[in-house]
């Protein structure tokens, strides 16, 4: 069985036993801005929703099992959930936000992998 998650580094392949492989089939990141720069009036969940929509565009994805959002220096709340609500995904798509500063992106990939590999 092969399942992909639409975030993280491209072309990463994990093998789980002899039965299941987990693939990360694409990756993007939000733009990096500066204080009072071009994104000063743009909410981070809007940028995240644009990333989600861009990642699922061009792929035959019928549903997304979950959103795992790595976030540093957040303003509070579940930005992963807000991203999902503002994207083209179903409102029933669950989401979690991981806030570990510099380690949040890697931890979100690890959590998504564990979630998929365990069959949850």
Language model regions located:
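Active-site nucleophile and cofactor-binding loops and adjacent substrate-binding regions
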Residues: 72-73, 95-104
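N-terminal amphipathic/hydrophobic targeting modules at extreme N-termini
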Residues: 3-5, 9-11
């Amino acid at each position: 069985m092969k399942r992909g998650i639409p975030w993280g580094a491209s072309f990463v392949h994990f093998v789980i036993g002899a039965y299941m492989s987990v693939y990360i089939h694409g990756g993007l990141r939000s733009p990096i801005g500066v204080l009072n720069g071009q994104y000063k009036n743009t909410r981070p969940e809007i940028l995240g929703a644009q990333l989600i929509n861009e990642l699922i565009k061009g792929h035959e994805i019928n549903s997304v099992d979950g959103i795992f959002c790595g976030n540093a220096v957040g303003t509070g709340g579940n930005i992963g959930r807000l991203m999902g609500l503002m994207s083209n995904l179903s409102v029933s798509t669950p989401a979690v936000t991981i806030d570990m500063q510099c380690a949040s992106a890697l931890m979100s990939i690890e959590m998504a992998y564990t979630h998929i590999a365990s069959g949850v």
